Amino acid sequence: MPSRARLDEFVAAVVSGDHAGAIERYYTEDASMQENAALPRVGRDVLVAHERAVLERVKSVTSTCVASVVEGDRVAINWVFEFTYHSGKTARFDEVALQEWRGDKIFRERFFYDPSKPAA
């Protein structure tokens, strides 16, 4: 079960822009991530590689934690991610991440957001 302090450390890492590093430090080796109803990606190395590939496609990303809740081994985070692509186009995703933790690391995470929002 994560402590509030541990969750706050994770959030701070993401907000600082260290997305791949946060996965390396805060996810179990066998962790999974799932986008809406898509098939989950499994394995921390796979998750890190995917995150790095996403970040290579953008000029910048701003990550904001709107709210977070810890309830035992379950965590909910409302994130807002604002992307600026190399083309200059932008996109904003307001999403909820539901996480299941094992001890002080994330084991399973699922993101819920509106996938139909095009880049501005």
Give, region by region, the residue ranges found by the protein language model.
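Basic/polar N-terminal segments that are highly enriched at the extreme N-terminus
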Residues: 1-5, 118-120
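A solvent-exposed, acidic/Ser-Thr-rich amphipathic alpha-helical stretch
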Residues: 5, 18-72
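Hydrophobic alpha-helical core bundles mediating ligand binding, dimerization, or RNAP-core interactions
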Residues: 7, 11-14, 27, 51, ...
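Hydrophobic/aromatic beta-strand elements that line small-molecule binding cavities or substrate pockets
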Residues: 51, 63-69, 80-81, 94-100
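Short, cysteine-centered beta-strand-loop-beta hairpins and adjacent loop/turn segments enriched
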Residues: 57, 83-92
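Residue-level signal for tight coil/turn positions that link beta-strands
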Residues: 72-74, 103
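Short beta-strand edge/turn micro-motifs at domain boundaries
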Residues: 94-117
